[in-house]
Amino acid sequence: MEIAVQCQNPTTDNSDCVVVGIYEGGILSPAATLVDLASGGALRALLDTGDFTGDCGDTQLLYQVPGMAAARVLVLGLGSHGKVKDSQFRKAALAAARALQGARVGRASLHLLDTPVIRRSAPACAKILVQAVADAEYHFDRHKKPADAPQRPISELQLSISENDTAALAELQGAVAEAQATARAVAWTRDMANEPGNICTPTWLAEQAEAMAGRLGIKSTILGPDAMEALGMHLLLGVAHGSRQPPRLIILEYRGGAENQAPIVLVGKGITFDAGGISLKPADKMDEMKYDMCGGASALAAIQAAAELQLPLNIVTVVPASENLPDGQATKPGDIHRSMNGLSVEVVNTDAEGRLILADTLTYVERFEPDVVIDMATLTGACIIALGHQTAAVMGNHEGLVHDLIAAGKESMDRVWELPLFEEYQEQLKSPVADLSNVGGRPAGTITAACFLSRFTENYRWAHLDIAGVAWKSGEHKGATGRPVPLLVEYLLRRARQVA
């Protein structure tokens, strides 16, 4: 989909469809006012019928409106004037995109940047529009017959503003470029995560990462079991023992910054299918455990976006990829493995495997002498109980890093909430037979999982994102969401501005 920003009067816009907004109470946006005047009151007539009220997300498609160059006008409800929140603006944008799809519109022009959104600039609103349209356009249908695959009608999207301000246009075009890179990264993440476990194996995921890296000039290195054994990554290998698919450690290095710039390291959990191992999961919804590699896919996609935007940063992404299956050679509850950093771990529950593969990886990344390390993982069901499906959890050993991630999440509408990592929680990880246990019981499960990881991050600034509640959706709209890619890209953009 091609996206452009232009100064355009909606009445002379010759797109297939022009989109304008109306607020509750019949208040017309500036663009809608121009349409109403040119048409001799067509929008006022619509309001007089009572069929359209301006509620947020309401849509009404009008054909052959007098005085309009476009064949169609989509009227979009924006909610209460002066009180439009970013979440409402996104809801309206999604509704508009779906209405355009339903009308099979090829070229659409959105005259919505005149909408005052609380605490959001015009460039921020442009990003919301682009990402909302991209989300509405996304379909994962590669395994369906062509006749069953939904069409993607929008080929050209124009964001229109009323004033021909060169500086404003340039700023908006920059925001659109960032939003498009983010949207492509989100789509890549969703594509990887939506593939079934018989396709998305650790080896396949590594191959996809290598292909992406090759396209963008990113250095890629893939380690197998022999290299892991030589490094002493026995926690990662212990998780992989139950699978016939060999594990992979995927390492991508993007060097856009100065040679002496310490890298930002992204670590993502890459369990391509998680049956729980010997601590077998219930059958209900076990199919969704293909999404247990969403953290890994997100970390890979974030470096893709950084490379596309040519950010002046050094970034390293490391993804431990494995399956977690039951087998005669699988790790058993009570087994003890020694981690790469020398700590012995009693594996009380083999379904708490994500923290094991992350622990060895967090030790491995010390060799990059990182500025910061951010890991992301669908780690605990307890996080869903605590925060639901709207917000991810963030914890870490550096207050500034945690706050930076919270700010990036707020700006990108990919929000996170901080949970504590008080030292007292470490008591729950004590083991009578090893240096620590891989589980800390039911209380504060999300926190104790992060406490476990913290034992392997003492030599650098670190933050952990538990994305278990936000990485995918169940039910009718089942599928990966692409989170926390928007947060990660926004964080990297902010870091890049600091360098510039």
Curated annotation (Swiss-Prot):
InterPro entries: Leucine_aapep/pepB, Macro_dom-like, Peptidase_M17_C, Peptidase_M17_leu_NH2_pept, Peptidase_M17_N. GO terms for cellular component: cytoplasm. One of its GO terms (biological process) is proteolysis. Binds 2 manganese ions per subunit. The keyword Hydrolase applies. The active site is at K281, R355. SUPFAM superfamilies: Macro domain-like, Zn-dependent exopeptidases. Its cofactor is Mn(2+). It is an enzyme of class 3 (hydrolase). The keyword Manganese applies. Belongs to the peptidase M17 family. This is Probable cytosol aminopeptidase. It comes from Acidithiobacillus ferrooxidans (strain ATCC 23270 / DSM 14882 / CIP 104768 / NCIMB 8455).
